[in-house]
Amino acid sequence: MTPKIAIIGEGVIGCSTALQVAQAVPDARVTVLSDRPFEQTCSFGPAGLFRIDDIANREFGKSTFDWFAHLHRTEKGDKTGVKLLSGHIQSDSKERLEQQQKAYGDIVYNFRFLEKREILDLFPNPSEHCIHYTAFASEGNKYVPYLKFQCQARGVEFLHRKVRDLEELANEGYDVIVNCAGLSGGTLAGDDDSVYPIRGVVLDVEAHWHKHFNYKDFITFTIPKENSVVIGSVKQENRWDLEITDVDRKDILERYVALHPAMREPKILGEWSGLRPARKTIRIEKVEKKSEKSGKKYTVVHHYGHGGNGFTLGWGTAVEATKLVKSALNSSKL
């Protein structure tokens, strides 16, 4: 009997999971369901620089980094959206940078603290401390479509549809349902009210001469993309509005230009806002269910709550979610 697997969410988490499930269970019928076009998801706009916020997620990040290294070796970057970038993170708090070192200093390449002379040479308005490293960046508007293409090549079907209740999918014959619904993940789960939005805004500007990422304390930054440079951002918890205001633009540009005056009066090519699906911890959990309507037994695998680290952690957490999917199928002998 062919197992039917539904994955809710077409962002980086849903597509990473769908590809791994299709590879791990090649005889399954895998369907990805999304209630909006990819361009309207939180995964479309990010430049995707590798950086781990929470040391507890180190292993997920390491798994993702290894996957990016594989893509870098074997595929063209203009197709995958994955490329190597070097750059700097500045802070007046050495402790914050030491936390970064513990979280991923031995995962990325060339991680080190800059000497005072280097900081003064490089930055017109320098912070007290600065780290340098080389890592992968994954452009959302290329990387996720690449994952989707790989899924479709393995027979995964993509449908635009709003799922209001997980049980409705069980009643349609799905044996395993993977909840990668991001900000809606807790609502769909029905037992989790801990997911909340962190509003983000970035500007795409023309600055072909700018080749390195540059951060000041994780909110003010630039990340080069293939044809533009991203300037960001804001991190506003529990704000649901997506409209980009003049206040947003002025705030972001003034903060970054104070850090790097050469970027003053940039030509803005585009802008994007999104709601990061935040949670205290990422939820990766298998729950056995039974439909009240039909009596059908089914399994839900929850996989959501990545906040702003979806691109850094998503492949690694999808490895764990896929293990739970396989475990569910083995238990039911499908």
UniProtKB/Swiss-Prot annotation:
FAD binds at D35, R36, S43, G307, T312. Coiled coil: none annotated. Pfam families: DAO. It is found in: Peroxisome matrix. GO terms for molecular function: D-amino-acid oxidase activity; D-aspartate oxidase activity; D-glutamate oxidase activity; FAD binding. It catalyses: D-aspartate + O2 + H2O = oxaloacetate + H2O2 + NH4(+); D-glutamate + O2 + H2O = H2O2 + 2-oxoglutarate + NH4(+). It comes from the Eukaryota. One of its GO terms (cellular component) is peroxisomal matrix. A motif (Microbody targeting signal) lies at residues 332-334. Disruption phenotype: Mutant worms have decreased egg-laying capacity at 20 degrees Celsius and decreased hatching rate and smaller brood size at 25 degrees Celsius. Mutant worms have high D-Asp and D-Glu content at both egg and young adult stage but do not show any change in physical appearance. Mutant worms also exhibit decreased fertilization rates. InterPro entries: D-amino_acid_oxidase_CS, DAO, FAD-dep_OxRdtase. Its cofactor is FAD. Keywords: FAD, Flavoprotein, Oxidoreductase, Peroxisome. Its EC number is 1.4.3.1. Not inhibited by potassium bromide or thiolactomycin. GO terms for biological process: D-amino acid catabolic process. Expressed in the intestinal cells, hypodermis and in unidentified cells in the head in adult hermaphrodites. Belongs to the DAMOX/DASOX family. Selectively catalyzes the oxidative deamination of acidic amino acids. May play a role in the egg-laying events and early development of the worm, in addition to quality control of the germ cells. This is D-aspartate oxidase 1. It comes from Caenorhabditis elegans. The lineage of its organism: Eukaryota, Metazoa, Ecdysozoa, Nematoda, Chromadorea.
